[in-house]
């Protein structure tokens, strides 16, 4: 079923970012652009050369790929004459939020691991690259679209917001969150009395939440101790601002939900059923972001999470700890949460696995698990009905799946009992009784023993 929907989603919305990579000093064959960015240093930097309309077709035209005449374009010649070069594509944006943005030559300063050379079209991009590339030694150049690079000045996706916000600017500063709304949490808050956001065709992401479980992991003498506190929605209020949801138009890209919660009562976390481990006070705030990524193959999953406001007060032996600043986790920290599905489907989950964030105490991590949540990234079933009334699609997957751990325990236990019963039955069937009146000299009971 997933394969069929993956194929269908490719037909509905297939988008990827083209890129041309080149370098004179570093072998780049087969290395994804994202890996090159992760390993970039000031001594071996990565230079993005971007314009909004870049495609491989545009590069082919500039390189005179369809004629026999040599190209006079600086970038085309640089790629052709480089020692290592290749073309790539990737299905979602590459994170380069700390890159040095260069839209003019006088903005350049040496020492950055990542640069972004930006032009509004090919000619301005090429001219600026010609001025700057020679100043950046041992670099890997990546010619691609502006949309392919995640940077504050290259935001490509529209924020889901009010009509007034959309008409002003996609890149306006984050508004202050308005709060005090009762649970359940639904963002964007479409057609709500307290904060009305109008549904728009093409932007159909939704996030629903009824509660949280806060999990504390503490390491002491090479042993991990866990304590948790279930916090129902009745103990929370939530807040929302116009920039709290990032919702691309399509199934491919990064979908971001920012959650702002405030505790309405004191909470006590327990180790087991009787031992107090930590507390959270009334008025404490919990702020975290969830980034779901839709890929080219028709799947989506939680790819990244960050927390900026999360703290506990511990009882001995648990330590008090807090998340200072914005802590970002990804990779193995998010891949086991079971928050994944197929393009066009929503996901319902009674309880997710916790996402753990590092704290100011090296031995303590604080995790957040979603309770009774539903997540939708893109609903292409009924776009007209969506605009009339925002809703979750009926195509919904559950994070538990058909066979849970409890189901398998029951199935295996039943199979073992059935096997024992069958073995006993077969053994009883092999017992033969003799009629002593036919031949009183024979043994009355014969039990066959087979090797």
From Swiss-Prot:
Expressed in pharynx, hypodermis, intestine, vulval hypodermis and the H-shape excretory cell. Residues 1-16 form the signal peptide. It comes from the Eukaryota. GO terms for molecular function: ATPase activator activity. The chain crosses the membrane at residues 408-428. Glycans are attached at residues 191, 235, 249, 330. It is found in: Membrane. One of its GO terms (biological process) is positive regulation of protein targeting to membrane. Keywords: Glycoprotein, Membrane, Signal, Transmembrane, Transmembrane helix. Accessory subunit of the proton-transporting vacuolar (V)-ATPase protein pump, which is required for luminal acidification of secretory vesicles. In the germline, required for the trafficking of the receptor RME-2 to the oocyte cell membrane where it regulates the uptake of yolk proteins. Also, plays an essential role in osmoregulation in the embryo, probably by regulating the proper formation of the eggshell. Belongs to the vacuolar ATPase subunit S1 family. Accessory component of the multisubunit proton-transporting vacuolar (V)-ATPase protein pump. This is V-type proton ATPase subunit S1. It comes from Caenorhabditis elegans. The lineage of its organism: Eukaryota, Metazoa, Ecdysozoa, Nematoda, Chromadorea. The gene is vha-19.
